[in-house]
From Swiss-Prot:
<dbReference type="Pfam" id="PF12826">
    <property type="entry name" value="HHH_2"/>
</dbReference>
<dbReference type="InterPro" id="IPR013840">
    <property type="entry name" value="DNAligase_N"/>
</dbReference>
<feature type="binding site">
    <location>
        <position position="398"/>
    </location>
    <ligand>
        <name>Zn(2+)</name>
    </ligand>
</feature>
<comment type="function">
    <text>DNA ligase that catalyzes the formation of phosphodiester linkages between 5'-phosphoryl and 3'-hydroxyl groups in double-stranded DNA using NAD as a coenzyme and as the energy source for the reaction. It is essential for DNA replication and repair of damaged DNA.</text>
</comment>
<feature type="binding site">
    <location>
        <begin position="29"/>
        <end position="33"/>
    </location>
    <ligand>
        <name>NAD(+)</name>
    </ligand>
</feature>
<keyword id="KW-0464">Manganese</keyword>
<feature type="binding site">
    <location>
        <position position="164"/>
    </location>
    <ligand>
        <name>NAD(+)</name>
    </ligand>
</feature>
<dbReference type="InterPro" id="IPR001679">
    <property type="entry name" value="DNA_ligase"/>
</dbReference>
<dbReference type="InterPro" id="IPR041663">
    <property type="entry name" value="DisA/LigA_HHH"/>
</dbReference>
<dbReference type="InterPro" id="IPR001357">
    <property type="entry name" value="BRCT_dom"/>
</dbReference>
<feature type="binding site">
    <location>
        <position position="395"/>
    </location>
    <ligand>
        <name>Zn(2+)</name>
    </ligand>
</feature>
<keyword id="KW-0234">DNA repair</keyword>
<dbReference type="GO" id="GO:0006281">
    <property type="term" value="P:DNA repair"/>
</dbReference>
<dbReference type="GO" id="GO:0046872">
    <property type="term" value="F:metal ion binding"/>
</dbReference>
<feature type="binding site">
    <location>
        <position position="302"/>
    </location>
    <ligand>
        <name>NAD(+)</name>
    </ligand>
</feature>
<feature type="binding site">
    <location>
        <position position="278"/>
    </location>
    <ligand>
        <name>NAD(+)</name>
    </ligand>
</feature>
<keyword id="KW-0436">Ligase</keyword>
Length: 652
């Protein structure tokens, strides 16, 4: 029986591969079902012989308790976006300046959810969401319910791959029809449906919804030399790989490919929102390297957003956490990119003036980045004596006079006691990317503020069960959960706290870069502007904003109150040594190294505090030149940049 179970498992897995990966079914559905039922019967009788990669392990359901955080061994970066041919040409120019013979691989940008799959000796161990690129969620049990993801590879490799999970248009339509019949809320679009499915706690639901995948990258080290070779290897290993891609050195041919794909976009069985262009050589990719946010060797061309006409009925003005007052248009409802849109941003007062937008105008509405509804411009041919929009002079929340600084495009409320400003600041502090206080959303924050329980973020840590119980709709169990979430947030790493403070220009990635150097929030109270500006990826604007914030007496008081409440001030990641020999220097490696390989040299430079980049520019501080160094060495000499050799590096 053990032998027969093995035969059936291998046979069914091959049929599944033919169907899902090669798109060439090699057996009828009835024959497949017959073999499948035989395997199920045998496995029930001999459970000790069930194999890890059995197709029966991908059906049925398990109720999960939740999803654990998962730290990616290899960070998953986002891509730089491009919206025009000019931006693609600029990318091409940057790459060709370093590598004149570079070729590109253009691939479809699938509109789904980015996933990471890790295998050990050929067996699937972990499936995770991208998250913020460093930390995602472990969704392995749900990943196993996606039929075209192999549980066992065709070779016993230890490998981590990246791809996109998506829902086909056909599956999306069928699911929404079922939800409509059952009186359930329909999904807005296939991407939202896929996202909701991957976060299901009932794995049977995941199996039923028939997600699919396309894999496109080996994020762990690979023996392949070219990206097109990586795609071929992924297909050989049993993954689904998108068949549409083009290899070329010509941006003209890339543009023709983009236009061809855009024209047939609606004929595909799944949603795409653009084309990704990658340098095909993996060695060139390594030399080009990364910015803080994205690889320098790839760019994502986004298709133009869908546009619709709508009428502006009224405008709401709201105050954000930094005091910026943002206008939002209320519109006649329109269907846009799979959702009903009745509100759209007008950005700021300068934008309204530039476009001459008025109440009652018919306007063109689109989704910026296919996400945020925005007003593009006015359909002037349909204007009929609409009145010029009145720009508020007073804050809609506190009544203070609004200011319009010369160097800004927005109106701003500068009253630190403005109720909306305080509430938005509290909401931001509790948000997922900041302190991640589960349950403490806008509605609860508003109730706490109006009840007088919170006036700044430190007050959150003084809240009691009795405080919550006084709020409408809060029962004892909810109060206990909120207090537990608040207590749990105290142990967050300090970069989440720094981001949560809502300092202008200090985002989540910048917060991490700052704490990698300073290590502790308290150290920022005495940090110097010029020191902060030296940190790789930052600059004078960020440095000025940070020092101005922490120079305020109120900042020192707030930090002290948070510390007294038990909130962690320390960065839990690996700290950068600001006293290191090469701290803050931008270094380029070029030529052949004899004693160190390139990764070893890069690791040593980064350990010494340097930022390693792939191109020489005026911003380069140092070039490490090996033998046969070419154009980069010559450029460094012409710019008067310091040049050292491998022996010098080894002696540091």
């Amino acid at each position: 029986m053990k032998k027969r179970i093995k035969e059936l498992t291998d046979l069914l897995n091959r049929y599944r591969y033919d169907y899902y990966t090669k798109d060439a079914p090699s057996v009828s559905d009835s024959d497949y079902d017959k073999l499948y039922r035989e395997l199920v019967t045998l496995e029930q009788s001999y459970p000790e012989y069930v194999l890890q990669d059995s197709p029966t392990q991908q059906v049925g359901g398990t109720i999960l308790k939740g999803f654990e955080k998962y730290r990616h061994q290899y960070p998953l970066f986002s891509l730089q976006d491009a919206f025009s041919r000019e931006e693609l040409d600029a990318f091409d120019k940057r790459v060709k300046a370093e590598f004149p013979n570079a070729t590109y691989l253009a691939e479809l940008k699938i509109d789904g959810l980015s996933i990471s799959l890790s295998y050990e000796n050929g067996f699937l161990q972990v499936g995770a969401t991208r998250g913020d690129g460093n930390i995602g969620e472990n969704i392995t049990e749900n990943i196993k319910k996606i039929k075209d993801i192999p549980h066992q590879l065709s070779e016993p490799l230890t490998i981590t791959v990246r791809g996109e999970a998506y829902m086909s248009r056909q599956s999306f339509k069928a699911i929404n029809e079922g939800r409509q019949e059952n009186g359930e809320t329909e999904f807005a679009n296939p991407r939202n449906a896929a996202a909701g499915t991957l976060r299901q706690l009932d794995t049977a639901v995941v199996a039923k919804r028939q997600l699919a995948t396309f894999l496109y990258q080996e994020v762990s080290p690979t023996a392949r030399n070219q990206q097109n070779e990586v795609l071929a290897e992924l297909a050989d290993l049993g993954f689904s790989v998108n068949p549409y891609y083009q290899l070329t050195s010509s941006m003209d041919e890339i543009w023709d490919f983009i236009k061809t794909i855009e024209a047939k976009r609606d004929q595909l069985a799944y949603d795409i929102d653009g084309v990704v262009i990658k340098v095909n050589s993996l060695a060139m990719q390594e030399e080009l390297g990364f910015t803080v946010k994205a690889p320098r060797w790839a760019i994502a061309y986004k298709f133009p957003a869908e546009e619709k006409e709508a009428e502006i009925l009224s405008v709401d003005w709201t105050v954000g956490r930094t005091g910026v007052v943002t206008p939002t248009a209320n519109l006649t409802p329109v269907q846009l990119a799979g959702t009903t849109v009745s509100r759209a941003t007008l950005h700021n007062v300068d934008y309204i003036a530039e476009k001459d937008i008025r109440i009652g105008d018919t306007v063109i509405v689109y989704k910026a980045g296919d996400i945020i509804p925005a007003v593009l411009n006015v359909v002037m041919s349909k204007r009929n004596q609409q009145e010029v929009m009145l720009i508020p002079k007073l804050c809609p929340s506190c009544g203070s006079e609004l200011v319009h600084f010369e160097d800004e495009v927005a109106l701003r409320c500068i009253n630190p006691l403005c109720p909306s400003l305080i509430q938005r600041s509290l909401e931001h502090f509790a948000s997922r990317d900041a302190m991640n206080i589960t349950g403490l959303g806008p509605a609860i924050v508003e109730k706490l503020f109006l009840a007088g329980f919170v006036h700044d973020v430190a007050d959150i840590y003084q809240l009691t069960k009795e405080d919550f119980m006084q709020l409408d709709g809060i029962k004892e169990k909810s109060a206990d959960k909120l207090l537990a979430a608040i207590e749990a947030s105290k142990s967050n790493s300090a970069e989440k706290l720094l981001f949560g403070l809502g300092i202008r220009h200090i985002g989540s990635k910048v917060s991490r870069l700052i704490l990698e150097v300073y290590g502790d929030i308290s150290a920022l109270l005495t940090a110097k502007e010029e020191e902060i500006a030296r940190i790789d990826g930052l600059g004078s604007t960020i440095a000025q904003s940070l020092t101005q914030y922490f120079e305020q007496k109120t900042a020192a008081i707030l930090v002290d109150e948070l510390k007294t409440a038990g909130v962690n001030m320390h960065y839990s990641g690996q700290k950068v040594n600001s006293d290191a020999a090469l701290f803050g220097l931008t270094v380029v490696l070029t030529g052949k190294l004899n004693q160190l390989n390139r990764n070893e040299a890069k690791d040593k430079l980064e350990a010494l505090g340097a930022k390693v980049t792939g191109s020489v520019s005026k911003k380069t501080d140092l070039v490490i030149a090996g033998s046969d160094a070419g154009s980069k060495l010559e450029k460094a000499k012409s710019l008067g940049i310091r040049i050292e050799d491998e022996d010098w590096l080894r002696q540091l």
